Amino acid sequence: MQKLPFAVLAVWCLLTAACVQRVLESVPAHNLSQEVPEGYRAIYREIDAEIDRQLPLIPLPWGQKKTDTAFGVELLAANSNRGETLLSEQVVHATALTLDRLKALGVQSVSLSLQYPVMTRNHPQTAEYHEFYRGVAADIRKRGLMIVAEMGSAFREPELSRLEVDYRGLKRDKFGAALREMAEAVIADIRPDFLTILSEPDTQTRNTGLSFSPAEFAATVRQVVKDLDHPGVKLGAGAGSWVSIDYFKALAAIPELDYIDFHIYPVQYGFASDRVLKAAEAARAKGKRVAIGEAWLYKVLGRELTRISQVEAFGRDAFSFWQPLDENFIQLVVNLARTIDAEFCSFFWMKYLYAYIDYTTETSRLSPGQLMTLSDSAAAENILKGKLTPTGERFRGLIQR
């Protein structure tokens, strides 16, 4: 997500006959629950079949033994897309409580997303953001958790970001210079174990209006990391598993990077299995480590991927009937992380480890934005109580070392 992922899918895959045929021929792997509403049954069947098809592709080659992958979640309470809301005493206390719950859940790492221009000198409240994130980092360290920081740009949609920022007229070199300034501040204030400079080039294009070919994206990342002083902080960059592998190859060629980061959302077309395995192979060939910086199941049909809005897709996540698919997706990604020996693996929508919303006549009429807000409130209530969903319980069992 740094974000909340995600972007325009590579057109080539949607036009590839084999890929389209594979999705169209998908059949449900399990009996469909009557709880799944009629309007969502096609999506459910397609995703269920895709996960069932891909699980055997990740054969757990380590012989069932645990790996050193640091499993964790996005600390949504401290995501800078929340804007000025972060700068309140209430959020500080809520973040500390959330960290207590995550520690009890068994996570080993916590991810922080920071969007340009937060923590740059030109931002009017940069001092307040510096203070907030220094405090959050200290709270994370007190609990013995690893810190992953990821930089990027803010979403344009008000449902996804409250940062008031206008990227019109932004040039690529200015964006790179600002990210360099942010990186220096993040290293000084947060001192993360891992710092992902930039990911999801297609998302950055949609947010900023800047184009990013593989070469252009790699050049921007190189602008940030060249001669960057980063004692004790590993540097990385990445992309979504749905884009061309050329992005991963271009990033892997950057000498200053320690790791390549993958984001996983849609499962169609092998995006949660063989595509990641191939990208990991390309990274390893250049001596890079690998990581899964964001992952959550994207509830869309394969044919919707190039046209559905993120707001609509993320609104679908809220309903409780998705729970079995979320659990199976988590299993798939955990298996994948261990197979590629990922440094860390972070699941984005941590709120669904604590609460879903039931699909009712009333909730079926809510807009995607309203569903997202309602699910936030439900999760906050259950985090306060320390109550997990079955998805949260499954997650806890899967990530145990």
Task: Name every feature range the model reports, one short phrase each.
Residues 7-16:
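Bacterial N-terminal signal peptides
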Residues 19-85, 105:
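Mature N-terminal, pre-catalytic/accessory segment of carbohydrate-active enzymes
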Residues 30-33, 37, 291-401:
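Substrate-binding cleft of secreted/luminal carbohydrate-active enzymes
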Residues 69-75, 110-112, 147-151, 193-197, ...:
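Hydrophobic faces of well-ordered beta-strands that scaffold small-molecule active sites
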Residues 76-94, 165-174, 239, 313-326:
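Active-site mouth loops of central-metabolism enzymes
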Residues 89-117, 192:
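Catalytic domains of carbohydrate-active enzymes, especially glycoside hydrolases
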Residues 98, 150, 232-235, 243, ...:
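Glycoside hydrolase catalytic-domain groove-lining segments
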Residues 120-132, 158-255, 269-278, 285, ...:
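Active-site cleft segment of glycoside hydrolase catalytic domains centered on the general acid/base Glu
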